């Protein structure tokens, strides 16, 4: 894929961009507008930033076809560029249909197909930036007296959603079209670490007691606890290096807040938490169960399960979930304290809060 003006750094784009590209390609096919070609591939131009008409990017279209006279289907494939992202290469389908429109009807209807999540009220998990992107790219092309119905389908969405904490924030049965920009915000690259370090330095100039939140979900939990946003730092996958950086730059305390399925890695001494680096979560969970008095057979059952969430559900049925979560929080605190002492050569007061998929706090340690 290409930008209208190419930079030297490879670029990747967020899931909403590909959903909109698929819908736009399908609409163009219905209207008889030929797609462009670049390097022998079909591409569709997408206006990626609502504030800038010039910010157009070209997204490859894998397949496009008319299904009936008024319906079409197009497929693109998610490409986050050099950044680590679980949606890499996942197909993004858009089924579109032109319908007669009454004057009082909206011209554009967005629906969640298979694999695109729904919010608890049943509406599609399509958030503000994505909705605006659909509007600016589709509304100008809808014929007068017609409305366009768009159904986004993510065939791998339900499976991929099991590896996220979306359900903790009301996104059910699939992925969400999230984000506030077209380009992927790096979470595991060296560039993202440098950005986080700079933000950490700025916050430490004003506050010596900070909250490290793992991702936007952790940030939402922190804000619900009444924590001032100015004290919150989103740390993505670089928890260990940023803890050390905070200690070296004079932080007095750090409160770690995160989804248990992510922070659990710290209990096993894994301080760069990207799944592309290491993933021993079920093993860590099984070890915590044994430490709390669980049986070898119960630990074996944990190891047989596919996800942390399934394992926690299993433990909950046995009455073990709460004590095991508390044990994990204790281990995280102990390991993180030792990590900072080892690599920064000084102590740092730490606290840990774990929350579950429903966004409810399930364990805390180190809280005064």
From Swiss-Prot:
Query: What EC number(s) would the UniProt record show?
Result: 2.1.1.195
List GO molecular-function terms, semicolon-separated: cobalt-precorrin-5B C1-methyltransferase activity
Q: In which pathway does it act?
A: Cofactor biosynthesis; adenosylcobalamin biosynthesis; cob(II)yrinate a,c-diamide from sirohydrochlorin (anaerobic route): step 6/10
InterPro entries for the chain: CbiD (IPR002748), CbiD_sf (IPR036074)
A GO biological-process term: methylation
Q: What is the enzyme's class at the highest EC level?
A: transferase
Q: Which UniProt keywords apply?
A: Cobalamin biosynthesis, Methyltransferase, S-adenosyl-L-methionine, Transferase
Q: Which reaction does it catalyse?
A: Co-precorrin-5B + S-adenosyl-L-methionine = Co-precorrin-6A + S-adenosyl-L-homocysteine
User: Which sequence ranges are marked TM in the entry?
Assistant: none
Pfam families named among the record's database cross-references: CbiD
Q: Which family does it belong to?
A: Belongs to the CbiD family.
NCBIfam families per record: cbiD (TIGR00312)
* Entry protein name: Cobalt-precorrin-5B C(1)-methyltransferase
């Amino acid at each position: 894929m290409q930008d209208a003006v190419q930079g030297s750094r490879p670029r990747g784009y967020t899931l909403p961009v590909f959903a909109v590209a698929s819908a736009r390609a399908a609409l163009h096919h219905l209207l008889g507008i030929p797609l462009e070609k670049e390097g022998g591939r079909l591409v569709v131009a997408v206006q990626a930033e609502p504030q800038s008409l010039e910010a157009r990017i070209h997204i490859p279209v894998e397949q496009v076809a008319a299904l009936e006279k008024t319906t079409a289907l197009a497929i693109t494939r998610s490409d986050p560029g050099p950044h680590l992202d679980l949606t890499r290469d996942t197909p993004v389908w858009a089924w579109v249909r032109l319908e007669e429109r009454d004057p009082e009807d909206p011209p554009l209807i967005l629906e969640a197909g298979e694999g695109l999540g729904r919010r608890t009220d049943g509406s599609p998990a399509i958030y503000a930036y994505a909705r605006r992107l659909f509007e600016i790219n589709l509304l100008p092309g809808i014929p007068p007296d017609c409305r366009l119905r768009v159904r986004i389908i993510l065939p791998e969405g339900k499976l991929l959603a099991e590896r996220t904490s979306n359900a903790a924030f009301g996104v059910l049965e699939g992925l969400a079209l999230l984000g506030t920009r077209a380009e992927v915000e790096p979470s595991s690259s060296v560039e993202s670490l440098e950005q986080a370090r700079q933000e950490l330095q700025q916050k430490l100039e004003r506050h010596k007691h900070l909250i490290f939140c793992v991702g936007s979900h952790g940030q939402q939990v922190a804000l619900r606890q009444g924590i001032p946003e100015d004290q919150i730092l989103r740390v993505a996958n670089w928890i260990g290096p940023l803890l050390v950086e905070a200690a070296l730059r004079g932080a007095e305390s750090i409160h770690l807040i995160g989804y248990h399925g992510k922070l659990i890695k710290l209990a096993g001494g894994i301080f760069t938490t990207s799944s592309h680096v290491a993933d021993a979560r079920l093993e860590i969970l099984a070890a915590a169960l044994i430490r709390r008095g669980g049986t070898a057979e119960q630990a074996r059952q944990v190891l047989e399960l596919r996800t942390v969430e399934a394992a926690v559900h299993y433990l909950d049925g046995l009455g073990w979930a709460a004590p095991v979560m508390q044990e994990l929080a204790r281990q995280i605190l102990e390991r993180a304290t030792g990590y900072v002492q080892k690599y920064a050569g000084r102590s740092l007061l730490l606290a840990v809060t774990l929350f579950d998929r429903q966004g409810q706090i399930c364990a805390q340690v180190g809280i005064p």
